[in-house]
Every structure is written in C-alpha cells, then in structure tokens.
Amino acid sequence: MPIATPLTELLGIRHPILSAPMDTIAGSRLTRAVSEAGGFGILGGGYGDRGRLETETAELKGFAPFGIGFITWSLAKQPELLDIALDARPQAIMLSFGDPAPFAPRIRASGARLICQVQSEEMARQALDAGAAILIAQGTEAGGHGASRTTVDIVPAIVDLAAERVPVVAAGGIADGRGLAAMMMLGASGVLIGTRFYASVEANGAQEAKERIRMANSNDTVRGVVADWSRSLFWPAPFTARTLVNDHIRRWTGREIELMQRAAEVGVEYAAAKAAGNFEVAAVFAGEAVGLIHDIPPAAEIVERIATEAEQLLTGRRNSVRGVLPSPLVGEGGA
C-alpha cells in the first residue's frame, strides 16, 4: 500500500517522492517519468535559458502533475521566465536560494503551489511569510548548491518550525527507501531526490557523468566554490556547490583567490572541457548519496524501489530489508 502523507494528499501523488530540478539534467523526460511512476517530477529552470525552458515546458503542456524549479536569485534577473513557466500550467513552482516574496503572488494567483527550499529557520520563516505551501529542508549532503547544516539537523528543525502548517520535505543524501523512511521518522512528509535521479535513463546528463556517479563512493564529493568560479558564477553566501572530486577540483582547491583572478582564462578551459565531455575538468554535481548508487535504471524503477523499501520499513516487514525500525515505531507510516 502506498505511503500516504500530507504531501501526497496536497499534490495528489501516490508516493512522497519528488525529483529535484537539477538545472539542465532534469528535463521534461525525467520530469514526466517520475510523475508517471507516482512521484512528482520537477523540471529544472536552472540559470534561465529561455529557449530551453520554452522547449521543455512545451513537452509538458497538458501533462499533470509536475512542477518547475528556479534558482531564485537568477530568476530575479529574468522575471519574465516565470510567465513562460506558468503558461505550462504546472501544479507547483519551486524556488530555491533567494527571497521568494517577489514571485509568490503571481505563483499563487496562477493556482500553482509555491514550494520553497530552505537551509535555515530564517529562510523557512521567510518562505512561510511568502505563502509557501511546501517547505523543502535541504541538508549539506545534497549534490549541487546548498549550505552547511546536515539533513538530520535541518529537517526536524524545520518540521518543528512549520508546526504542521505545511508539509516539510527532506533533501540531501537520500537515495533509497531507508532514507525516505528515516526522514519520515524525523517528521518529513516526503523527500526530494537529485543525485539518484541523475543516474537514471531519462536524465539529460552525459553517460560518462552518470557512470562517474555510479562508480563513486561518498568520500568522492566535496563542497566548495571551484566549480562555480570556473564558470564565472559567483553565488551569494552561504551557498556552495557539492560535486564529484576531479583533477580540476584538486588543482584549484586552496587556490580560490587565484582562480577568481584568472576566471576568464579558466572559464575558457572549463567550457571547452564541458563541450568535450571531459569530466576531469567539467564538474559532475552530485551528493554524498553517490555511495548508495550502483546502477542507472529507468526513473520509474527508482521511484518504485524507494517507495517499496520505505513501505517495508515503515510497516515492519523484514524481508530483504536491513536495519528495520524498532517495533514501537512501525506501522505508523505517515508524517
């Protein structure tokens, strides 16, 4: 039986599993595949490539349910992109890394739910004041951009702050049903998953990048600024990017000031490497959950695996599941 939570009820989905809006990686194929499997796919709006956004949203018009996610500080530079997104009639718009207030009225007026990703209580209060319908509490284990607090710290803190006013979704270091079950025990209504879906058939990433995720372990990631500054992307504090370690990261870690001074030169090298698929220079944005990823299956299979394993844990079924929950807690499978 699917796990019912306030999140599944609010979004009308079978499983409390959302796929992260990973810039260009989370295209319409991945978004649709996750939603068709009973989760909630979120298209990546990224840094605001208008042409790509128009193409990807055109593929999703008339489809439901799905969401579209934006980097808030980048969207502020091209606010007209929100109109393109809303024209596709998504069920939700997800905003991360910035003040959602300037965009919240238009989102709510469209009928879409406002999802806000936060990394602190202050950000959560700001999101609630803006009318967020769902909060995503992101831990530092997450791939791509994030802050410094761990998932097991930030999730219950945001759950307590929300005080059941809105569902809270956990993000960061989650790749299987054990992660979903654990986050629900912390009070989350579901999970947002990125890296595990990056290593899926439908993700837009290069096959070499997916293979690097599959072969990596959790010690092979690092959080820092090298990948961003190599692209002349200077994110606001406190946000940094978690990537797989490669030759380029090793070369410039500890030399960030020099990197900033040589950003134009390094940027040419980085862009050429990305175009050539050279991932010893170009970054693979991935989280600490890489150590739990050992294959590259269809997204639907990932959703079903996670949902089934979590259900087994939360209902106390022991077949093929390790580390089951103590008996006083099983069978309460909601959040």
Could you describe each region identified by the protein language model?
Residues G323, G331-G333:
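Glycine-biased, low-complexity coil/linker segments
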Residues I25, I174-A175:
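Residue-level detector of alpha-helix initiation sites
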Residues E59, A64, E141-G143, V268, ...:
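Intrinsically disordered, low-complexity segments enriched in glycine/proline and serine/threonine
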Residues M1-P167:
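Active-site entrance/lid segments in N-terminal catalytic domains of soluble metabolic enzymes
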Residues Q117, G172-G173, E332:
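Conserved acidic functional residues
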Residues S148-V169, A175-R322:
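Conserved active-site-proximal phosphate/metal-binding subdomains
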